[in-house]
From Swiss-Prot:
GO cellular component: nucleus
Annotated compartments: Nucleus
Claim: Repeat is one of the keywords in the record: yes
Function: Probably acts as a transcriptional activator. Binds to the GCC-box pathogenesis-related promoter element. May be involved in the regulation of gene expression by stress factors and by components of stress signal transduction pathways. May regulate negatively the transition to flowering time and confers flowering time delay.
Annotated source species: Arabidopsis thaliana (Mouse-ear cress)
InterPro entries (UniProt xref): AP2/ERF_dom, AP2/ERF_dom_sf, DNA-bd_dom_sf
Keyword entries, A-Z: Activator, DNA-binding, Ethylene signaling pathway, Nucleus, Repeat, Transcription, Transcription regulation
Family: Belongs to the AP2/ERF transcription factor family. AP2 subfamily.
The protein, known as: AP2-like ethylene-responsive transcription factor TOE3
Origin superkingdom: Eukaryota
Gene name for this UniProt entry: TOE3
A GO MF term: DNA binding
């Protein structure tokens, strides 16, 4: 033990067991002799820092699989083929078809499709099958023939021709018109609506900065649709969207052009004859004007003669010797003066 006041003792002190300090007991010696055999075992679990990191895990590769060769190089991971992302979306919970959902409030099967991050309404239908076909048509129009659809692409070969002439918006309107949820009073044909009077109204929308152009009322729905088609062709030409095949109107236009050409030729021939008639009429008019002038002159002469005879008769009645006086006045060259108290009567003869 150490003496804090004095210098430490130089004699050897013994521990509680009687062994001197600094002496190693048998237990420690045994552990010391066993320690060299334990170190190699601990080095396997905790390798020294001098070892390379690749050597530590020589028996394992990067994916956790053992390397049978023991070369220490990790095996290349297997590259799985890329999964094709489906653009058709998940199946509907209420229908077996894609893009079809049943709505209890309306009692109809409604069809929707996603385009550019927005859900587009395609219409409401009475059956899920009709709604699924509407979805397929829209998917083919928006995404091409490789789109995921409910039925075979062969069922829509006839629709592909119509899709090429329509834009997305126009094709959506076509699908909505074919649906059951389209408003009442409307027609399945483009540009045709049922008027209040019971006839079908045809009008062309958004033309020349106008909301619509009124085309008229028709007795049948087809006549109104044909009127719309003709107006659309005149405004937009070959790019016009029509209800029926534009070739039908081309044939009608050819027939109308031939009729117009024939009518023009007939008008020319009639024009020649009409010019001759005009000459005759002008000649007759000139002759009649001459006759009127002659009759006017003749009538003035006759009226003057009648007036003269009337004055003479009145003079004879007023004067007893009126004949002798009138005769003398006439022989002398002076015309008889009418009586100031009597107004002479004038006679006008009408033209025969």
């Amino acid at each position: 033990m150490w003496n804090l006041n004095d210098s430490p003792d130089h004699h050897e002190e013994s521990d509680s067991r009687g062994n001197p300090v600094g002496h190693v007991s048998n237990g420690m010696s045994q552990s010391a002799t066993w320690l060299p055999f334990v170190l190699p075992v601990t080095r396997n679990f905790f390798p020294a820092q001098s070892m390379e990191p690749g050597v530590r895990w020589s028996g394992f590769n990067s994916v956790g699989k053992s390397d049978p060769s023991g070369s220490g190089r990790p095996e290349e991971p297997e590259i799985s083929p890329p999964i094709k992302k489906s653009r058709r979306g998940p199946r509907s919970r209420s229908s077996q078809y894609r893009g079809v959902t049943f709505y209890r409030r309306t009692g109809r099967w409604e069809s929707h499709i996603w385009d550019c991050g927005k859900q587009v309404y395609l219409g409401g239908f009475d059956t899920a099958h009709a709604a699924a076909r509407a979805y397929d048509r829209a998917a083919i129009k928006f995404r091409g023939v490789d789109a995921d659809i409910n039925f075979d692409i062969e069922d829509y070969l006839d629709d592909l021709k119509q899709m090429g002439n329509l834009t997305k918006e126009e094709f959506m309107h076509v699908l909505r018109r074919q649906s059951t949820g389209f408003p009442r009073g409307s027609s399945k044909y483009r540009g045709v609506t049922l008027h209040k009077c019971g006839r079908w109204e045809s009008r062309l929308g958004q033309f020349l900065n106008k909301k619509y152009v009124y085309l008229g009322l028709f007795d049948t729905e087809i006549e109104a649709a044909r009127a719309y088609d003709k107006a659309a062709i005149k405004c937009n030409g070959k790019d016009a969207v029509t209800n029926f095949d534009p070739k039908v109107y081309e044939e009608e236009e050819d027939l109308s052009s031939e009729t117009t050409r024939n009518g023009h030729n007939l008008g020319l021939s009639l024009g020649e004859s009409s010019s001759e008639e005009f000459r005759l009429k002008s000649d007759i008019a000139s002759i009649r004007s001459r006759i009127r002038d002659e009759e006017r002159l003749l009538g003035s002469d006759l009226s003057l003669a009648m007036m003269t005879t009337t004055v003479r008769s009145e003079k004879q009645q007023s004067d007893g010797g009126g004949n002798r006086v009138v005769g003398m006045a006439a022989s002398s060259g002076f015309s008889p003066q009418p009586s100031p108290y009597r107004i002479p009567r004038t006679f006008h003869f009408s033209r025969p």
